[in-house]
């Protein structure tokens, strides 16, 4: 559900427990997020405020944020005005998605300091605003002006004005009749406009969720939809409206609220609980966990799509290059014909008029003197036509060797690009994507496409540390144990290189699917040890699992001692050659 007024009020109710805490740290991880370090009651807490249009919220957080090395201007201003202040009060008004944090410092009784931090959680209009005791804005994360089609001025020295609302306040309703009287006019209007029968209204032809959401302040569409589902309401009646009213009241007045995750944790709903929560910040941390997973998933998806777009554009370029090379090779297949034309023209010069001839038919003495028609350019003399055919022949003959080399190189390049796509398909975390981005950034194949920005400044700002044999910081292959034997699996091309060429011992056994993109797999062994056949087969199955053909059957897997695996100088990441191998089919 949306972070609506009901969630805002419920979160703020828990945050009453941070009254008396002092602000001792202020960070701004990104342009939409501020975190406040709080100290009090012998504990440290971190309050997260996010004004991203899709994920705006306020809650305590247990997830560390990566902060820029240089604090942004707004962060510096908040540090100046907030650090050392104590939280005097935290509250909301009605069901508005606005949280007010009153701050004070009474260390100097003659000069008390009072400030207010206002968090407006209103989608794309969200903001973080700092005011003084007279409601004069000191600064805000986003500035707006009535000159820019805004209904309020939000900038330094302007007076803070509470946003207007044309909706009813649910909290000011005293009875169900007040609730129904607010909805009834819209109900009648909707029935008249759509020529509906009041006796035959149901959820399918009447948008009750939208009507309630549009009538009452702070109640989101998804919140009402969940209530309709929980109460199993299909028909529109006054009794059902009363059930909805009572359910909203129950949630708002509940002392213990929890969240219910649905659809593989893609959404959540509030529900009342009879069990007292172990933590006084239960709702805060559960909603924080939900949004952390949601943002991480979105970040992963966006970052992956950016890299995939870059790789596919490069793949398309090299596939086009291969197509052009094949066209050139097809042209080279005709080069002997051009030589034949030149020879036959030369030997028949006495039979060809000097000019104005489009073609000539002569006997082909290479083919039992069978007749052959040779095209001519009528602008030129016959001898010059022959020279042109010899020139074409020599040009294609010289090109043939070069084009064959280019074709081999291009096929290897395409093979490497496809191996990177395989890596991307198997990436599980932002760190995995960061390693792939680092790999392609260092490769000349992608140089003209590398204008894409890393979606994850949080991930990409983290420079990959060099892989070392003793310091396994970046080098973190997948690890398995089969019948007591350790098996290591590379996660990307660079890690495959390091695993096989530097980390593995010469007596270890190397596995890789034959002619199929996949991970390098190393079976750790002792010198002169004979590995049982069933272990070799299980490791081969593991190698097949970590491959592009993992869903196929009868997959060929080559294996040999690491000492027989070599990496050619200048070859692409992940590319090796090997010998003395055996093959298992799994």
List each model region and its residues.
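Extended, highly charged segments
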Residues: 1-520, 524-586
């Amino acid at each position: 559900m949306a972070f609506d007024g009901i969630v805002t009020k419920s979160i703020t109710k828990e945050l009453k427990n941070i009254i008396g805490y002092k602000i001792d740290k202020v960070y701004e991880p990104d342009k939409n997020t501020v975190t406040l370090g709080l100290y009090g009651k012998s504990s440290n807490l971190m309050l997260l405020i996010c004004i991203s249009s899709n994920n705006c919220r306020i809650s305590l957080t247990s997830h560390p944020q990566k902060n820029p090395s240089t604090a942004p201007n707004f962060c510096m201003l908040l540090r100046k005005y907030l650090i050392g202040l104590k939280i005097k009060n935290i509250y909301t008004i009605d069901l508005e998605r606005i949280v007010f944090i009153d701050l004070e410092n009474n260390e100097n009784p003659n000069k008390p300091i009072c400030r207010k931090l206002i968090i407006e959680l209103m989608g794309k209009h969200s903001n973080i605003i700092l005011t003084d005791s007279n409601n004069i804005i000191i600064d805000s994360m986003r500035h707006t002006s009535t000159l820019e089609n805004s209904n309020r001025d939000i900038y330094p020295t302007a007076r803070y004005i509470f946003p207007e609302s044309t909706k009813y306040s649910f909290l000011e309703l005293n009875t169900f009749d007040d609730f129904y009287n607010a909805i009834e006019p819209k109900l009648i209007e909707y029935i008249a406009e759509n020529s509906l029968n009041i006796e035959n209204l149901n959820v399918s032809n009447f948008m009750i969720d939208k009507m309630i959401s549009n009538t009452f302040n702070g109640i989101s569409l998804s919140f009402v939809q969940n209530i309709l589902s929980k109460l199993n309401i299909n028909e529109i009646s006054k009794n059902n409206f009363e059930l909805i009213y009572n359910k909203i009241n129950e949630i708002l007045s509940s002392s213990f609220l929890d969240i219910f995750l649905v659809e593989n944790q893609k959404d959540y709903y509030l529900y009342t609980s009879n069990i007292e929560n172990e933590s006084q910040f239960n709702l805060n941390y559960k909603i924080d966990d939900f949004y952390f997973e949601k943002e991480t998933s979105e970040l992963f998806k966006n970052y992956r799509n950016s890299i995939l777009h870059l790789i596919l554009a490069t793949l398309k370029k090299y596939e086009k290059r291969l197509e052009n090379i094949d066209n050139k090779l097809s042209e080279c297949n005709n080069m002997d014909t051009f030589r034949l034309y030149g020879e036959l023209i030369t030997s028949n010069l006495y039979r060809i008029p000097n000019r104005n001839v489009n073609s000539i038919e002569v006997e082909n003495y290479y083919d039992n003197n069978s007749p052959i028609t040779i095209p001519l350019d009528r602008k030129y003399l016959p001898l010059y036509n022959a020279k042109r055919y010899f020139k074409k022949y020599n040009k294609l003959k010289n090109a043939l060797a070069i084009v064959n080399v280019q074709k081999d190189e291009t096929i290897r390049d395409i093979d490497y690009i496809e191996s990177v796509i395989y890596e991307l398909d198997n990436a599980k975390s932002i760190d995995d994507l960061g390693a792939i981005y680092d790999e392609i950034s260092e490769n000349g194949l992608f140089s003209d496409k590398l204008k894409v920005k890393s979606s994850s400044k949080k991930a990409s700002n983290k420079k990959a540390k060099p892989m070392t044999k003793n310091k396994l910081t970046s080098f973190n292959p997948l690890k398995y144990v089969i019948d007591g034997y350790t098996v290591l699996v590379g996660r990307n091309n660079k890690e495959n290189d390091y695993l096989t060429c530097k980390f593995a011992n010469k007596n270890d056994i190397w596995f890789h699917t034959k002619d199929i993109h996949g991970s390098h797999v190393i079976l750790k062994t002792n010198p002169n040890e004979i590995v049982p056949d069933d272990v070799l087969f299980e490791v081969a199955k593991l190698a097949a699992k970590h491959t592009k053909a993992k869903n196929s059957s009868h997959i060929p897997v080559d294996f040999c001692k690491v000492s027989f695996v070599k990496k050619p100088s200048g070859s692409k990441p992940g590319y090796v050659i090997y010998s003395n191998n055996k093959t298992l089919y799994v």
